[in-house]
């Protein structure tokens, strides 16, 4: 198999157990800076898999299943929650929904309301307080509430804009709005840059890229040889590090992405725009106050 950068790799380099894992998405374009957003949102929706019959969950085709999967979750959720809001899962007023939609610059009021249902389910999975704690995000992403994971730490840190140790609903909406089809390209570029700027120095360094790629692959069924990883990162920095100082600054990153637009293809999730079409029951059956 050959990558977009001209690398060739064999079965010894890549060991894959299932289709469309995080690692396979990463290696589909075969660059370290790919497939983060889609992996995150698929994982967030996958946290609701226990609401579906096992046969349905086992037989779905992952890439095309997002919409039908969320619809099934919506029907099940509305049936279970009819007539009550749930402890710790507060309601929103129409004014609050409108404010969040306006601040997002992308989502409609109905889309914010629909995403509120997803947020409530995640935020009540362990600690029933209507806030997403790191353990709850880890359970959503990796099916386990414990363990160390660099990828989880970075995603949580980017979502937790107020740095108070939890993800509030306005932060949840703000972070997901970056992946909306109508979100400015500049926002997508900046989000991807911040994900890899582990030390928050304003630069992406080689070691940071290596750490993040290893963390992502460790949660998938794919393994790459150390030699191949080094070769990929060498080529990436050769292309992106224009001033050859061993790190990628924000301007270099922007120019790199604009030369390789496929790097951000998974930073746009079309079904975020269709979320109310997929499950309109969210709009009419949720606990929203006038």
Curated annotation (Swiss-Prot):
Sequence positions that bind Ca(2+): 241, 243, 245, 247, 252
Coiled-coil intervals, chain numbering: none
One MF term in the entry's GO annotations: kinase binding
Pfam families hit by this protein: EF-hand_5, EF-hand_7
Superkingdom, taxonomy of origin: Eukaryota
Keyword line: Calcium, Metal-binding, Repeat
BP GO annotations: calcium-mediated signaling
Site residues by UniProt (Involved in dimerization): 220
Induction description: By abscisic acid (ABA).
The EF-hand domain, residue ranges: 111-146, 147-182, 184-219, 228-263
InterPro entries, alphabetized: CNBL1-10 (IPR045198), EF-hand-dom_pair (IPR011992), EF_Hand_1_Ca_BS (IPR018247), EF_hand_dom (IPR002048)
Tissues/organs with expression: Expressed in shoots and culms.
Family recorded in the similarity comment: Belongs to the calcineurin regulatory subunit family.
Oligomeric form and interacting partners: Homodimer.
Function: Acts as a calcium sensor. CBL proteins interact with CIPK serine-threonine protein kinases. Binding of a CBL protein to the regulatory NAF domain of a CIPK protein lead to the activation of the kinase in a calcium-dependent manner.
Name of the protein: Calcineurin B-like protein 9
């Amino acid at each position: 198999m050959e990558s977009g950068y001209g690398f060739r790799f064999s079965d010894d380099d890549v060991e894959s157990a299932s289709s469309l894992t995080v690692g396979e998405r990463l290696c589909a374009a075969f660059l370290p800076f790919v497939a983060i957003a889609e992996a995150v949102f698929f994982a967030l929706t996958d946290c609701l898999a226990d609401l579906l019959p096992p046969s349905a969950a086992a037989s779905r085709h992952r890439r095309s299943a997002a919409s039908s999967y969320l619809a099934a979750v919506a029907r099940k959720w509305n049936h279970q929650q009819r007539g009550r809001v749930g402890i710790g899962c507060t309601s929103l007023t129409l004014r609050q929904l409108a404010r969040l939609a306006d601040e997002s610059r992308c989502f409609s009021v109905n889309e914010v309301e629909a995403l509120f249902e997803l947020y409530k389910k995640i935020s009540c999975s362990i600690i029933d307080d209507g806030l997403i704690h790191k353990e709850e995000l880890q359970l959503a992403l990796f099916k386990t509430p414990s363990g160390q994971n660099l990828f989880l730490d970075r995603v949580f840190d980017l979502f937790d804009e107020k740095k108070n140790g939890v993800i509030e609903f306005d932060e949840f909406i703000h972070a997901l709005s970056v992946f909306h089809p109508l979100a400015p390209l500049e926002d997508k570029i900046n989000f991807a840059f911040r994900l890899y700027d582990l030390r928050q120095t304003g630069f992406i360094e080689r070691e940071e890229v290596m750490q993040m790629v290893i963390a992502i692959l460790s949660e998938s069924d794919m393994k790459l040889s150390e030699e191949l990883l080094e070769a990929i990162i060498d080529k990436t920095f050769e292309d992106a590090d224009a001033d050859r100082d061993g790190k990628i600054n924000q301007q270099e990153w922007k120019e790199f992405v604009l030369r390789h637009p496929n790097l951000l293809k998974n930073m746009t999730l079309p079904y975020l725009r269709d979320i109310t079409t997929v499950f309109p029951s969210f709009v009419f059956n949720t606990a929203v106050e006038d």
